[in-house]
Design a protein with these regions (language model features):
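Short secondary-structure transition/capping segments
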Residues: 4, 106-109, 220-224
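Sec-dependent bacterial lipoprotein signal peptides
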Residues: 1-25
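Exported/periplasmic ABC-transporter solute-binding proteins
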Residues: 27-68, 87, 119-124, 129-311
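Short beta-strand and adjacent tight-turn residues that come in two discontinuous sequence segments
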Residues: 77, 95-98, 103, 191, ...
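Pocket-flanking alpha-helical
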Residues: 80-111
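Short, conserved beta-strand segments within well-ordered enzyme catalytic domains
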Residues: 47, 73, 92-95
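Central regulatory/effector-binding core of bacterial HTH transcription factors
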Residues: 69-83
Length: 311
């Protein structure tokens, strides 16, 4: 009888202990959230404006070399598609040419109960490229505006990385044409920035519009090959001297070059995840140096401007 009682109590205690272990394990797993990535490990997809592909490829390459357990998969697309991905929750991080508007901030605050983080990490320039055989490589903004809206009657045409939804198109409509429309007989589209470069290389009297990171880095062998096919045009300076300037870093930093825009990240992440880790990386020294070496101008750190030449 005593043996049965002892055995019964032991069985009951074992059941309680097993239940406690299961309960503790469940709580511990919830607190640690092992299913989630951290700031330096895991895998995430990010959506990136295609005009920044060369420099963001460089950022990811260095980040993953520093953190071998981290994998960042960049999907390059138009800026409008990046914002659509953010709304649809198909990505938690995008890299584009603007931050959130007040209306967008309110939308995310209402739907997420927290504000997404965003910040400008670099300044970029929209470069104008021409065929090596073209005699003219100096343009006023009035001349460029006239080519885009067809008011000059000139034989020159323009090519962009798409006819809608790209950041370069938005910049041209908002900042050059001031809301007016393109002349459809004068403006054509390629699928991406590389297509723009190749089109200009094979056609005379065409102005191509691309982000400077596609053709500014002479340490990149592929970009050196581009510069054998096309030339970077000089645009009328915003300064009072009336000179013409190319998108050198000094001209980007001082806004002497007339077509400067920002590079922003927008992050929809409310824990210390891989998106935040990558955002911190491109914000601080190593990432800022990569922007510098890619001939953009860093927005978060001060650097000495060195002499550089773009063909």
């Amino acid at each position: 009888m005593i043996v049965k009682l002892i055995n019964g109590r032991m069985n009951w205690m074992l059941m309680v202990a097993a239940f406690a272990v299961i309960l503790f394990s469940g709580c511990s797993g919830h607190n640690e959230r092992p299913d989630l990535d951290s700031s330096n490990r895991g895998t995430i997809h990010i959506s990136v404006d295609e005009s920044f592909k060369p420099v963001i490829d460089s950022q990811i390459q260095v980040f993953e070399a520093l953190y071998p357990k981290a994998k960042i998969i960049a999907d390059y697309k138009s800026e409008a598609e990046c914002f659509k991905d953010l709304i649809k929750d198909s990505t938690r991080m995008i890299i584009v040419t603007r931050g959130l508007t007040d209306e967008e901030e309110k939308f995310y605050k209402d739907s997420l109960t927290f504000y997404p983080a965003f910040d400008k990490v670099a300044n970029d320039a929209v470069a104008v490229i021409v065929n090596n055989s073209d005699p003219d490589s100096l343009f006023s903004m009035d001349k460029i505006r006239g080519i885009l809206d067809g008011s000059t009657g000139d034989k020159q045409t323009a090519v962009f990385d798409g006819l809608r939804e790209t950041s370069t198109i938005r910049f041209a409509i908002d900042s050059i044409l001031k809301g007016k429309s393109f002349d459809p007989k004068k403006v054509f589209a390629e699928k991406n920035s590389l297509g723009v470069i190749n089109y200009v290389a094979n056609h005379k009297n065409v102005l191509g519009f691309v982000g400077v990171s596609w053709i500014g880095n002479k340490e990149d062998t592929s970009q050196l090959s581009f510069l054998k096919k096309v030339r970077i045009a000089a645009l009328e300076c915003t300064c009072p001297e009336g000179t013409f300037v190319k998108p050198y870093q000094a001209n980007i930093e001082r806004r002497r070059y007339p077509m400067v825009r920002g590079l922003y990240y927008i992050l929809k992440e409310n824990y210390n995840g891989l998106g935040g880790g990558f955002a911190n990386f491109i914000t601080y020294e190593k990432g800022q140096l990569i922007f510098m070496r890619s001939y953009l101008w860093p927005a978060k750190m001060n650097f000495t401007i060195r002499s550089a030449t773009l063909n």
